[in-house]
Amino acid sequence: LLGVVVGVVAFFIVSLSMERIESPHFSAQLSAARLMASSIAELSTFRESLGIEIDPSVDPNLTGLIGPEFTELTTTLGNLQAKRTSTNPDFAALLVKYFEELDLKKGDPVAIGASGSFPALLLATLCACEVLELEPLVIYSVGASEHGATHPEFTFVTMLERLVDVGLLKDSLIAVSLGGNYDTASGMFFPGARELMTEIALSSGKTFIYEEPLQAS
């Protein structure tokens, strides 16, 4: 009993002596996290309005950012737990911290190359850029690992278009490639996958990147 009392007293003393130190980037980090949360809420609602069901057994927080396991867009294996973790809006706050540590200033360009494997992390990056008034330049590849942006009617191209339409983000997409092996969607699981991915890339209206040598791509 004496040990318990001593432990409680020690904890109380430590609690009183604790000092809350606010991050120097707290305001921007909070804004970025809130923007990402608002974006996720918008995309979740939009996805359901398109008639694309959100499976709560796969996406328990109903973010809409976690796709099916296997579709024509699936390129590789993926970790479902990692996909769920990536939907935390705190990642936008973390990206603010990283950008501030790089001493990026308003108007600085940020080159972003991303596949559909982790749409939430791409969203986090764009939210951080939006808050810090940076200029993101995104090259996106349509292919995605399992449970990424694997639904053909709900790739990140569609997600970003929606967020731009409702005024949450600016259009930062400058080019689209297929992704997959050699960035040419070779060796896909489903027949006709490359054709579908090409259609998605072309329909984006952005520069389409397709080169046989990977270095050229």
Where are the regions a protein language model picked out?
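A substrate-binding/cap region within the structured catalytic cores of diverse enzymes
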Residues: 155-217
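Conserved short-loop catalytic and cofactor-binding motifs
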Residues: 79, 83, 113, 205-209
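Generic hydrophobic alpha-helical segments
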Residues: 95-99, 217
